[in-house]
Amino acid sequence: MNADFLLPYYTAQSGSSMSMFNTTMGKLQRQLYKGEYDIFKYAPIFESDFIQITKRGEVIDVHNRVRMVTMGIARTSPILPLPDVMLLARPATGCEEYAGHGQATKRKKRKAAKNLELTRLLPLRFVRISVQDHEKQQLRLKFATGRSCYLQLCPALDTRDDLFAYWEKLIYLLRPPMESNSSTCGIPAEDMMWMPVFQEDRRSLGAVNLQGKGDQDQVSIQSLHMVSEVCGATSAAYAGGEGLQNDFNKPTNVLNASIPKTSTELAEEPATGGIKEAAAAGAAAGAATGTVAGALSVAAANSAPGQVSAAIAGAATIGAGGNKGNMALAGTASMAPNSTKVAVAGAAGKSSEHVSSASMSLSREGSVSLAIAGVVLTSRTAAEADMDAAAGPPVSTRQSKSSLSGQHGRERTQASAEGCKEGRERREKDRALGRSSHRRRTGESRHKTRGDKIAQKSSSRSSFSHRANRDDKKEKGCGNPGSSRHRDSHKGVSHTPISKESRTSHKSGRSLWTTSSGSSKGLGRVSSFLRNVRANLTTKVVGTPHGRDVNVMAKMAERSTNVAIAETAEGGQGLETVGSMTPDIMETVTFEAH
């Protein structure tokens, strides 16, 4: 071996290079050995001649000439295990070098021919080499700019037949098919963010930069082919991580947004039903305590129609005690809203005024019917009123509490309770005086018997009025209390017994006034009681507001009037008082007869 071919470090024919390339020095390596590029002066190069073709395999000719390309794979440092540079050269054109000429010398021409001209020098990290067609021995080069070049092997006549197999082996070494993520050289991680990639991999450049900003001491062994795959996977993993985070956060947001919506939807309906049930239950509870009108009107305003009817029925059953009036109220309340209007209108009265007021609104209608029910439930005889007075205030006074303010209701309750109690005591004393006078005065038995008959008629009349109130449930105020003739045109059948009873009561009052002159002490007490009753009635009637409470006051006046009649008939005094209260009685009877 000549000394000219001996290299300081190694040559292509040395052991390492021969085991790697198994070829002799080519013309490109000989040209570089001359020192034009000092870095490649002693570098081993594996090279071959190719012709440039298209993707379809057609030969590219420029000016009817085939374009020849010499491609060499070189290793710039002996410490590198694999080649790191790709060189591209083409045949050089002839050129002439002109030497300087003087005035006394001749012009000299020297032609210096160059075999190859180096056109490209690319690191292998920026080039992807692949086999395009094995049979036609075609390769594909893809550059970092995104452009691709197709080359077909054009070996010389004296080359080996298995030259393309060496290229396949080299491609396999540069990028092993089983381990495609290996690289041909070490790439520092900090250099990767400045490394240009191919056009199809530019979408992953952000992921490369993020990956390259890790530890500065790390060395990446990923090849250029792996950059797109790994970067794509890394970006996908990073996006997937964000997706997972978004997915983890998204259900939380959805949960936070849907819990109010779900809790609102699920809570509103049961809450509404619960409020309605609570309103119905509260209505029944309020009815049990005696505030039937107020509680049931609230239930009618806040509850459904079915629940209103159930609440009214239950309230009437609990609060009334099971009498006939209670049964009528329950039957009316269990009807539909339209039927309830008709029933209430019929119960209130047949005049157009009551019908229009009943059909204006359901809540107002309910209050009117409840006021009438209060009159019916509390309209009893004098004996029942005496029995109830010993137990406590009547139901009508408790209903008047819910209608009026608390202070006025308590005063009226106390006044009515005291009035009933005093009336019972006076009746007992008067009955005792009447019995003693009957024993001492036998000659006056005929007058006494007539007075007893009048008392019985008055009591029967009061019981008849109470029964009429239970059946009709009508409001007060249809006639004029001052004119009996005007009421006669409206009363009809009830005119005759009322007028007879009133005349009989006047006559009996005169007879009792003349026959009971001996009992001055008892009669003085009766007159004081009647004055108290008159004062109570005046204050109550004046202070009563217009509306549903007028019915309760009319009932209370009726009860007090009945008591006054009984005492007057037995005591024999108070003719003027009886005359002034008789129109009230007649008015009440007129209300019941409609």
Curated annotation (Swiss-Prot):
UniProt feature, compositional bias: Basic and acidic residues = 408-433, 442-455, 468-477
Q: Where is the segment annotated Disordered? A: 387-524
Q: What is the lineage of its organism?
A: Eukaryota, Metazoa, Chordata, Craniata, Vertebrata
Q: Which family does it belong to?
A: Belongs to the GARIN family.
Per the entry, what this protein does is: RAB2B effector protein required for the compacted Golgi morphology, probably through interaction with small GTPase RAB2B.
Query: What protein name applies here?
Result: Golgi-associated RAB2 interactor protein 4
GO CC annotations on file: Golgi apparatus; nucleus; sperm head
Record keywords, A-Z: Golgi apparatus
Its gene is GARIN4
Q: Which organism is it from?
A: Homo sapiens
